[in-house]
């Protein structure tokens, strides 16, 4: 297995990263242009979200050809140059494999529509009448999870958009096709893979109505998932690659199996439970303040259980589907800098592999779009109409989108203070964040030792410098309040203790360990330290502190 305990991954959403040809869309040459910046940041892998040919109904997660580059992003030669240039700087590329579904424009689906039974078996088609849907399962993007094709008198399953048809992994030919795609990219010099919603690919043989939910309990972590993953990794020859699975509505038990080295499935897992603590009754589109007690409990559960079972966590707050974490759990104004640093430190020093999403390292904020016309995300547009239909006012629906839309993370990267943030010379495909201001740019933070960007560089360097962060055991400390999370990492004689104040109030916490007198390794306030003789410590708003013997 690859050694990934001291590595850090940087996620790039190419469409919004850097536009070099003036069409308003980011491109592969834009990634090449910024490689020196990424090398200086200190990251090891660059995860690129899909750049494959796609009708872009779901921003590239509707793939029409897995072994080509969409001309919008550049050419295969550009990509090969990116692979070479990244490698020359000690960084590997991680590609995003969307294997639960293809675009309905993919040649396989087109052949299926034309009546080719071989290719109909590549997907999940069910015979039926237009007025009798196979099951009551719901799409992740709203509405039914089935689509009727009158010409075929069949329904096809699509857990996401109508243009994203689910693949039939029970068909060995499908699995062989997917292995071939991995081999193709492996031969191009790709060093790592991220598998999109991979725990949804194994569907039950008999599909039935779900009267208790939206159907997910029948297909999440499905009947043959572990068997199929082992086969995919083994036969594609990627056992020694860094691999990460995006796991939708999964459990710790399954993630231990997915990521324990002896299982030979994946290196690590993304789970999203900690990012649902502000979902009212588990509903993404129902807002409520974050439940900090729940957040703490989830971190403790996933860290401790994965450690016990030899599993490995992918540590993250942000990605192309999530709102900006500073807007969500931090503070956009008075404590912008402190809260961004605290949130970064909280996950970077845990047991697992940290992921940074573009712009997170400079504290980028949510989009805050004032009108529906500015949104582009298919999920957001669908749910805007669902919210209105369910009785919300236009103002309420927009407030919900402002907090939850995936477009929050997709606004153009803010390189400098120019009109379009140095992303492009022309109007970008998605409007700039309304929270765009000069201090939230790479240029403003690059040479400032107190900046959020400098703080991220320090965190990345610490993981490489101190084995206790990469390899140490984790345990959690009782702080006496749900607003402060504290944990300890230990490896032999090395130890660090991390304190994180999760909100904008001062909190006095229990702090009576022998480590109180240890040197402060990193903090987000100036010259603060604990009294070696005391038993409590009063934390400033969003304060972060690491003490240690390393």
Predicted feature locations:
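C-terminal beta-strand-rich structural cap/linker in extracellular carbohydrate-active enzymes
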Residues: 531-550
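Active-site clefts of carbohydrate-active enzymes
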Residues: 312-333
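Short, solvent-exposed loop/turn segments at secondary-structure junctions
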Residues: 15-17, 52-54, 99-100, 163, ...
């Amino acid at each position: 297995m690859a050694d990934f305990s001291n590595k850090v991954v940087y996620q790039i959403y190419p469409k919004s990263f850097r536009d070099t040809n003036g069409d308003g869309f980011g491109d592969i040459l834009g990634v090449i242009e910024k490689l020196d910046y990424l090398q200086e940041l200190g990251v090891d892998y660059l995860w690129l979200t899909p750049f494959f040919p796609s009708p872009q109904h779901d921003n590239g997660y509707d793939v029409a050809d897995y072994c080509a580059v969409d001309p919008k992003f550049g050419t295969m030669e550009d990509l090969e140059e990116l692979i070479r240039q990244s490698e020359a700087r000690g960084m590997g590329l991680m590609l995003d494999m969307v294997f639960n579904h293809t675009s309905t424009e993919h040649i396989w689906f087109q052949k299926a529509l034309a009546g080719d039974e071989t290719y109909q078996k590549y997907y999940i088609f069910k015979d039926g009448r237009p007025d009798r849907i196979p099951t009551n399962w719901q799409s992740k993007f709203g509405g039914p999870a089935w689509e009727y094709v009158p010409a075929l008198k069949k329904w096809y399953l699509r857990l996401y958009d109508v243009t994203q048809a689910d693949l039939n992994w029970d068909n060995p030919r499908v699995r062989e096709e997917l292995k071939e795609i991995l081999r193709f990219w492996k031969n191009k010099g790709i060093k790592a893979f991220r598998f999109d919603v991979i725990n949804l690919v194994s569907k039950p043989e008999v599909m039935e109505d779900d009267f208790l939910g939206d159907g997910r309990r029948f297909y999440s972590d499905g009947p043959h998932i572990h068997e199929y993953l082992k086969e995919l990794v083994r036969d594609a020859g990627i056992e020694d690659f860094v691999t990460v699975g995006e796991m939708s509505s999964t459990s710790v038990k399954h993630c231990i199996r997915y990521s324990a080295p002896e299982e030979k499935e994946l290196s690590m897992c993304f789970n999203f439970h900690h990012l649902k603590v502000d979902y009212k009754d588990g509903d993404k589109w129902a807002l409520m303040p974050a439940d900090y007690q729940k957040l703490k409990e989830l971190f403790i559960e996933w860290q401790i259980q994965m450690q016990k079972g030899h599993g490995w966590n992918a540590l993250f707050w942000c990605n192309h589907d999530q709102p900006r974490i500073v807007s969500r759990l931090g503070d956009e104004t008075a404590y912008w800098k402190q809260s961004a640093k605290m949130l970064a430190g909280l996950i970077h020093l845990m047991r697992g592999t940290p992921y940074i999403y573009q712009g997170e390292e400079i504290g980028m904020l949510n989009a805050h779009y004032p009108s529906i016309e500015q949104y582009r995300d298919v999920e957001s547009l669908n749910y805007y109409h669902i919210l209105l239909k369910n009785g919300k006012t236009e103002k309420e629906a927009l407030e919900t989108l402002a907090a939850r839309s995936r477009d929050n993370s997709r606004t153009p990267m803010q390189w400098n203070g120019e009109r379009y943030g140095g992303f492009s010379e022309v109007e970008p495909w998605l409007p700039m964040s309304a929270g765009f201001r000069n201090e939230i740019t790479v240029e403003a933070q690059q040479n400032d030792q107190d900046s959020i960007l400098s703080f991220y560089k320090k965190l990345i360097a610490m993981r490489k410098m101190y084995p206790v962060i990469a390899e140490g055991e984790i345990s959690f400390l009782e702080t006496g309040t749900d607003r402060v999370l504290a944990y300890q990492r230990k490896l032999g004689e090395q130890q660090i203790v991390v304190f994180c104040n999760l909100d904008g109030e001062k909190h006095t916490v229990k702090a009576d360990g022998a480590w109180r007198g240890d040197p402060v390794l990193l903090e987000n306030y100036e010259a603060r330290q604990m009294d070696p003789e005391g038993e409590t410590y009063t934390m400033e708003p969003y304060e972060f502190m690491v003490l240690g013997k390393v």
